Structure formats: C-alpha cells, structure tokens
C-alpha cells in the first residue's frame, strides 16, 4: 500500500521558472492517513529574486523576515530531498498542485542538480485534491459544501472549502496549515465517496487512464473551468501523433455524420474553430469516469443508446481518423513555427 506525501509551497510569485519557494510544508501519512513524519521549513530570500507584493500579502510575510531566515534556498532543498528519499511508491498529494506546486517542486530540484521528477517516478503518483473536490461536487454535490463568491459563482479556494465544511483553518496560506486542511478535506471526501476516490486514484496513473479510455471507447470527461463544471460524453478517436501524452476525443452531443466526409483541409478549419473535439492530457490526472455519469445529464440524456452507438460507429471511419492525424500534425507544425525564436533563459530550459 502507498503512503501519502502531502505538500504545499508558499512562494515569492506565480512564475515557477523565476520565483522562489519561501515556505515548504510536507507531512507523510501512512495508508490509514495517520501522520508519520512532518517537515515545516523556510528559506532565506535569494539575492537575485524580487518578491511580488501581492504574494507577500497573501502569505503574510515581510521583507525583513524572509531576508533573515537561517537556511538558504539550497539548504532547504537538500532537507526536502533528504526526507523524500526515504519514501517510494507513494502518492504526492496537494491542492491545485499539478498546475502550481509541482512545477515549483521540479524547478527547485532541477536548479540544485537533483532529479526533478520525484512525484511521478519510482512508483510515485500524484493526487490533486482540487480535482477530487470538483469531481465530487459535479456528481454528488451533497457530499461537499461549496460557497459562492460575490458574483454568485461557486468558489473552490482551499480556505473557502475549509470554512464551508467547518474545518479549523486559522493560518491560511501557511504551508503546513494548507497541507493539514488539504488532507482533512481529502479524508472527508473519501469517507463519503469511497468509490469516486478509487476512480480518482486510478486517474493518477497515466498508463491506467490511457488503457481505460482506449478500452471503454466512450467515457465521461469532467473539467472545472471559469467557476463552472463542464461534463462531456466523449468518444475516443486517436492518440496525438506528436504529443504522446494527449488523447483526442469527440464530444457526442454533436452529429459527426457530415464531419467524417470532410477532407483534411476542411476538417482543419472545423478543428480550429469549433468545439467538437476534446484533448485529454493523460499525464495531468484528467477526471475520467464511466459513461453513465454524463449519459444521465443534459444534453446527453436526450439521446438514445442507438443514437450514441451510431455516432460511435461513424467516428470509427478510417479516412476520417487519418485526416484527423494530418490535422493534428499540421497544428503542431504551425505552433512550432509561431513559437518565439528568442533564446530562453537557463531557468526556462527544464523541459528542453
């Protein structure tokens, strides 16, 4: 069974390539969510880093304190690495971590000449509790309380979820406090939705996600964008010919009968300007579920099984799939041609 390595960073800004981690909180939990080890650590501000005023306000830090911390950024990184080197086959858990904390994590390891991909190698996987919370709310909204903001839109910020679900959270944006609340939230959701948690953990494996999508052919895809849930019933089409971590699907609320007859030039125009297609990044823990979830919701509820199956068969058209592959290659080539020709700074070359 896997341990859970829950973590959170407080930083000088939002740019993982140039900003710095000022606070790092790590708590190791066993398979029963009992605490095993804890690391709460800070670093001294690097002389070449200018912190964002907004970041300092959010994190309740001042310049004098971050300039007088005992440990350097390098020393903090070594302490983190020493702790984590004891653990393998673990889940790295965070809140909105795949899009934020993980990029900082990789950057600080890489900049200090350490292997940067700890979270998804050596049997390790990633669990982003933000994805779990939004998934649960989309399909079982009585399992989690979510407040609305001043504009009347649902709000999934960690401190707001803590308040609406009655968690004690006195030190929001203190790294170790954020870790503790993230795990409280995950435990509450597990207790109420053990089946969805199983689904959530399976989505953390790139290999399992790909196998599931290919084998099931039709599935539910959930995204949370711009303060709203987006639920799609999707038919898997092909793997991206250039970007191997992307699968391409078709939104089954649309009729493909005419589309499959297009040549690749006409299809390219549709691909660019319409929302028929869905890109699934299988290495970013996408929210993939059984087709029954989307099938029970509008607009897919209006279609019969026979209508869905007809679309499924139409989209298996060999010439259409070959044309789609041409379209994807063309898109990739145009992206490469339009990409900035400026030589990147060294800090920006982690994926080069």
Predicted regions and their residues:
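Conserved non-catalytic scaffold segment of RNase H-like nuclease domains
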Residues: 1-114, 119, 155, 159-165, ...
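A short, structural micro-pattern
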Residues: 20, 35, 121-123, 241-246
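Short loop/turn segments at secondary-structure transitions that flank enzyme active sites
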Residues: 47, 133-135, 189-192, 255-258
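A general structural signal for short secondary-structure junctions and capping/turn motifs
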Residues: 83-84, 173, 237-241
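Acidic, Mg2+-coordinating catalytic module of metal-dependent nucleases/exonucleases
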Residues: 91-96, 100, 104, 142-207
